[in-house]
Amino acid sequence: MMAASLLRRDKKSTAAHLKADLKRTDNSSGLRQLQELLDSVLNPERGSDPEALDWCKWLLAGGDGFDEFCRTVRSYDNATLCGLVWTANFVAYRCRTCGISPCMSLCAECFNNGDHTGHDFNMFRSQAGGACDCGDGNVMRESGFCNRHRLKTGENVPSVPRDLLLMSEMVLPRFIITIIQYLRDGYTEPESAADRDLQKVLQQLDPHISFLEELTKMGGAMRTVLTKILTDQQTFKELSMGQEDNVYAKKNYEKYLSALKSSGLVSVEEKGAAGGAGDGTSDAAAGAGALSLLGATATASLDDSSKEEDQDGLQGVGQRKRVKLSSSTKDPSIMDTLKHKCFLEELLFWTIKYEFPQKMVTFLLNMLPDQDYKITFTKTFVQHYAFIMKTLMKSHESDTMSNRIVHISVQLFSNEELARHVTEECQLLDIMVTVLLYMMESCLIKSELQDEENNRHVVVNCGEALLKNNTYWPLVSDFINILSHQSVAKRFLEDHSLLLLWMSFVSFFQGMNLNKRELNEHVEFESQTYYAAFAAELEACAQPMWGLLTHCKVKETQDYTKTVVRYCLETLQMWFDAIGFVDEPSLNQLTFHLPLHRYYAMFLSKGVKCQGLDLDSLLPDQEMLMKIMVHPLQIQASLSEIHSNMWVRNGLQIKGQAMTYVQSHFCNSMIDPDIYLLQVCASRLDPDYFISSVFERFKVVDLLTMASQHQNAVLDSEQERPMLEGALTFLVILCSLRIHLGMSDDEILRAEMVSQLCMNDRTHSSLLDLIPENPNPKSGVVPGSCSFEEMLSGVADFKAPVFEPGGSMQQGMYTPKAEVWEKEFDPIMVILRTVYRRDVQSAMDRYSAFLKQSGVHTGNPWPPYKERTPLHPCYKGLVRLLHCKTLHIVIFTLLYKIWMDHQNMSEHVLCMVLYLIELGLDNQVQDDKVEEEPCIEEHCHDSWFPGTSLLSNLHHVINFVRVRVPETAPEVERKRERERERETPPSTSSESATFGQNLREAQVFSLVAERRRKFQEIINRSNHEASQAVRPKSSASRWLPPGTPPQLVTEILEIRESMLSLLVKLHQKLSAKQNSLSLSWLAEVDPAHHAHGDGLTAIERILAKASARSRHSKRCLQEICGKVCPPIPPKKISPGDKKSMDKEERRQRARERQQKLLAEFASRQKSFMETAMDVESPEADAVMDVSSEESLDSEVLYDCVICGQSGPSTEDRPTGLVVLLQASSVLGHRCRSDMPKRLPTTDEEHIYPEDTCGATHDVRLSLMQRYFKDSSCLQSVSIGWDGGVYVQTCGHTLHIDCHKSYMESLRNDQVLQGISVDKGEFTCPLCRQFANSVLPCRPGRGMETGAWHAPSTKSMSTLVKEVEDLQEQLGIFPVRASIKQRDPILIESNLSKEMESVIKDIKNTTQKKYMDYGKNPGSPDNDFLFMYSVARTNLELELVHRGGNLCSGGASAAAKRSCLNQLFHVLAMHMRLYSIDSAYNPWTRLTLSTQSRENEYCDEERPEVPMLFRDVPSLLIIFILTMPQPLRKEHFTCVVKVLYSLQFTQALAALSIRFSREERLAWSNTGAAKKNLPNSDKSWESLLGHMISELTKAKDVYDTNSEETSALSSSVWSPQSIEFRLQQFCLPFLRLSCLLQHHLYGDSLPGCLVEEEFSLLTRCLGLAASVQCSGSMSSAACLEWNISAFDLISQWCSEVVALSDTPSQQSASLLGQDPQWAAPRLLQLPDNYNTIFQYYHRKSCSSCGKTPKDPALCLVCGAFVCLKGHCCKQQGVCECVLHSQHCGAATGIFLLINASVIIIIRGHRFCLWGSVYLDAHGEEDRDLRRGKPLYLCEERYRVLEQQWVAHTFDHINKRWGPHYNGL
């Protein structure tokens, strides 16, 4: 009842009344009233009601206004943290200098208000959302706080008055329970509602949660109240279940309980009733494994999984069955117990249930600055952790959900203090590991590695969604995050049961994604599961490993390492048992995933390197080592197999795996530990055993025979060579790589850097990316740290970014210094680090180029040999590999085979063999003290060599070798020959003794048997015969005739060579000289000289080292070199061999020929490109100006680039010039000032477009059209400043009929990108330049020469009359029409048809609005104006391209593009269709040749435009175009002279307007005084005076803007300044006339200084006598009047005076025009990109008010536009395209704010131009991915501007695509 009465009162007074009641000491009635009111207002059954929110706001404010209340609360804000929360795509900052946690981030405001000068920071776009850490000393250093959070704000904030938040404490609990009840009510389990529309529920709650968010933003005081309510258990208890009588609340609570149940969770009470499984469970009792505990939802039943088709392309039987595990999970309660004790806990529960709605997440995070809340919330989060991950696994939106989860967890776990706290109190580590295990257990399958039938190991199935979609990453990322804290990692390493659990987790990945080699047909479905496998190993196994390793750096942590190593070995042993592994890997199986091996390897390495542990104490017994070595070795051999195309039937993905394995992000977690582990095994196992294992794994044992032929059971012959090369390269890497064997971190970084730079020049960012970094961000050597930069400057030179003429933009690159090539280039490291084999070649090519350039070596060099860092003492055993007999036998055999030219040997094989010998010489075994060979004969039947030292074995001679060969082999043939000749071996006793002693088994095959025997002795399985080692041979061998394979027979070969003698013979062979090494050579040799060179150098270096290190070797060498007899090749090679050799040689020669041809072709093409592509190199001298080709009177001949014929252009078969027509507004964007306009970057700055050339001319024309006759206006100005048509050519010509067939063929060719043939577009057939029309060349001579050029002696008046006659020649027309279309009289020829078609093209080039300026569009007047303006546009643009003047003279790039001569004739031919009626012919009014007809003005509705208002260059073009062509030069000069007088008079008028009244008076008097002097018509003083006196008659022309002029003329006008101004005023006209004369008559343009330009131009145009001294040139001296100058000026002024109805200021502005414009410029941009970005990326769109997704800026006018924005679309055209049409006549240059790149729109196409903002390393940062500070690159911006002005975008940028109006 009471509530009802309260509800009726107004809210304000109710709230005030209640607050007063509650403040009393006895507040019970107030409380009761409030509760009743709230029961009624916040009734959850009423749904979400805006009224309820309104009530809450009034109640909280307690009678004040809510906004007022907010302000008051905010004034008590004591928060010292920023805590601003943002969502995905927000722009934030990260400073590595200030960050303690790598996840630290700052909002833009805090970043900009802090001082981060010189720090290593970057801007980034948030992926998952985040929060600002400013003020949080746990996450970042205080020095980085902004000035707002640097002060400990809390200290000086007054304490909060009790009653301020009194109402909040009462009202908010009820408000929050309402939200919770609403969430309970709205939730339905997925089963019940098919579409389960949780979004709807959330939408209705939106205002409520937004209100909570608003409260959090009131600051610390309000957050404290909220925290109290959210965490108060008592309030929760009272409100959660509801009072007895509240049926709704009861029902509601039951819904909550059922939701808990359905989630597979049990509340603790129920659990207790079931017999307290709780915390009492011991580790062992956990028994059934995480899976079985998960109630109904979790058990992944078999039926479920077997329904899913088997998609991962593995050959399972039918479907793969998932496997259930019983691992001893730590604590079953982790996965299924939840008990909520406060609002916060239940709120989080619903947040999870509703899959993390953004608003809820933001609210929960906004509360974090409150410390109490932070701790409670973190505990709550951990308590719900298992539940979160279970929900994530079931979610359909797992991506979004993952991001939201990490958004929260990263805020909590980055804080070490907090992470440690929850690890200790809430078992965070146990929870995480258990949940990880539980997650992976849902997708386990039986492993098929090794023993497919009896394999007991289970692995994850990489085809499962969980792995494919990376669903596990939030969990793993949290795990890595907490392991980065030392205190947490230590707990983990100390907890042995946890470690064991972790090892079992890692073993799930051991052997995953197994590949089986396809032997028959190509695999049908190429599985892409390998992406998931590599990602999983890196993220779930390697990164936690790196995290743990960072905490095992010092001696004190030895025990951790020992423990991990022990558990690794135990788990590995279990794994070997589970997969049934004995001693041999199964054939044709390959997995790249051995995380257990890698954990073991990395902890070993760390223990030895950093903790001083003894390696042997960490190693298992020999048997285990032999097992451990097998799988990593298998991977190395398989890499070779993949590169030898043996896995080609498995598809491309297998190559993808091989590449990923060595790729920079993976290599130090994969191939590096593998190689290190093999190095450890090699250093501890018997070297003979190890070497023979390698050759057996690589399947090349059969090849290692001295026989010339052999059978290989496992390899095709074309696979033998790459596999042998692979095996040897692997051995070299194994023996020479020192990454884990003694190099310091700095040395490693340097070696990595050098190897990457040697492959290619690199940008800074790609180098950062390619250097394998320790994936844990807290590790020491991080790319980007100081050591990285120092190292980089030590090894590389910076090449600044350049713009290549071809238009491709280079970034700033780093290139190796010369001394790096000389001393540090390490081909072995390069081979290890190359993803693509071609990179090795690239490094070698660059090396060879360096040697040539520095003159060290000119031929093709071999990879240089590099001295190695000394081995760490623990790994000394590795050297024994190089000193074992097995390797020496292999080396001997291969040297022999190469010398004998056996098949499948190669330069690379020799190179690697020599490398191994040299490594052996450089790394002697320590205990081998005896220098000469020991006498002990080893008890070993493969005793080729007496001892193991390489040095002594080098000179050991081997006389005879026993080989097993097929009967057909040449060796058998030779033996038969010998027998036929009764040739027996010599039989003296001593000889036969050595014969017996030196008979060797050549096949290393016996070694394999030996290896097997040793292996089996160790494993105590001696009952197996060793004989099983001899493999059954395959029945078919490739190079034998079909049928039964020939029997193998044993033969004895006579060899009598030592390794030394073979090396000498190979030297002779390579140098093709018989005695290439003389005796004297040995004496003077110096190994240091032989660092760089080819095979000869390498052999010489080895021989020098051998003789330097052993006297015996030196003696043997002298003997060998002393026998300077020609080498006798051992017996003949069989004809079959010969044939194959010849074939190979022929092939080689053919290949070389082909290479040579290709190179020649390429160089020809290149030289052509250099001459032809004039656009690319503006300064080239090869002028292609067709007009200047012929200066003789003969006809011009043109070459057709299509048919190749040369001939004149004729009426019937015209030739045309390839041209590109494009509309252009470049001229219209010119301004008066030379300084470009600045791009606005604050709200105060603006750009005003009114002062541009285009705008000024528009205003001028519309002004004239208001007062004068339209047809006259249209001949008084030019248009085309905006949207004018510019014509340019590449200079190539073709027959027009050839062109048509060319276009036809293009039409049928669908592949052309970005070219629209329907629009007439094509590329020039010769130079491939873009074009869209053909301009016909008129037949006849190229230039008007001879008689046409003769200097004229006629008087001025005669010439004036002749010109008038020429104009009349075309016939007289009726008086009324001033311009009239004339009927074509001629029958059209092909030429005229083409000319008309080009005119049509020209008209179609620009938009209608740029053509119609007349009152009646489409009229002849309009057409006439458009046509002559095309000529004007092209002349003006050529002037702009020449730098705005003609001082540079000669041929410029612009001249080469210009086709004005041809264009002029086409326009003239078109204009011939019009004639100017003599009555209105301006010529008569210019020369007063007929008396003026003033009387006729009266019947005209409007006067004509006075001469003084007309644009003089326009008149020039009109006259020249309408007179018959070719025009004599004397007539041209006459027209120029007459027009110069007018231009000069206009200059005087314009000048006089700028004078003050006194100055006018003074000059008028001076002029009058001089008027009667002789030659007064050539003195500007008298003319100026006359002008002023005439114009003063007009009503107030001079008196309009007296204030402005007085301001203008504050400077005093001296005669010099007046002369200068007059010249400047006339210059634009003179330049244009001169340029036109140059194109019509071929006159040259001599260059000159700027100050001499006026005199030079007047001389060129024949205005001034050439004798005049250039210094004192007077502009008036060039005048030539055909009648009295004063009469003419009076006449012209009278036209202005007669204008009664034109307002005077208009007349003044038309008179005071200034024809000068500065060069066109793009906007001036700020130096720092951040200035643009900060202002524009948040700026809102003018049409919809929202922030655009892709904002862009027009760099021409500064307009802010939406790229692709639908808000600004008009008629299906997006804003950028629209703007490009409006602003640039279809050319637009836009800077994309969020990407820092520039796009160009040209017509219907667009292209990405690149960026003009580069970082400190000269690199672009497209899409701002790296977020480093960017600075304006002036050179690039200049190039962009040049391309815009020169209209060369189409030619220079190659990658164009259609935009379909969508930009």
Swiss-Prot record:
**What is the reaction catalyzed?**
S-ubiquitinyl-[E2 ubiquitin-conjugating enzyme]-L-cysteine + [acceptor protein]-L-lysine = [E2 ubiquitin-conjugating enzyme]-L-cysteine + N(6)-ubiquitinyl-[acceptor protein]-L-lysine
Where do the ZnF regions (UBR-type) fall? 80-151
PANTHER family listed in its UniProt record: E3 UBIQUITIN-PROTEIN LIGASE UBR3, UBIQUITIN LIGASE E3 ALPHA-RELATED
This protein is called what?
A: E3 ubiquitin-protein ligase ubr3
Q: InterPro entries recorded for this chain?
A: E3_ligase_UBR-like_C, UBR1-like, UBR1-like_winged-helix, Znf_RING, Znf_UBR
UniProt KW keywords: Metal-binding, Transferase, Ubl conjugation pathway, Zinc, Zinc-finger
Q: Where is this region: Disordered?
A: 302-330, 970-995, 1128-1152
Q: Which GO terms describe its molecular function?
A: ubiquitin protein ligase activity; zinc ion binding
Lineage at the top is: Eukaryota, Metazoa, Chordata, Craniata, Vertebrata
Q: Where are the zinc fingers (RING-type)?
A: 1270-1328
Protein EC: 2.3.2.27
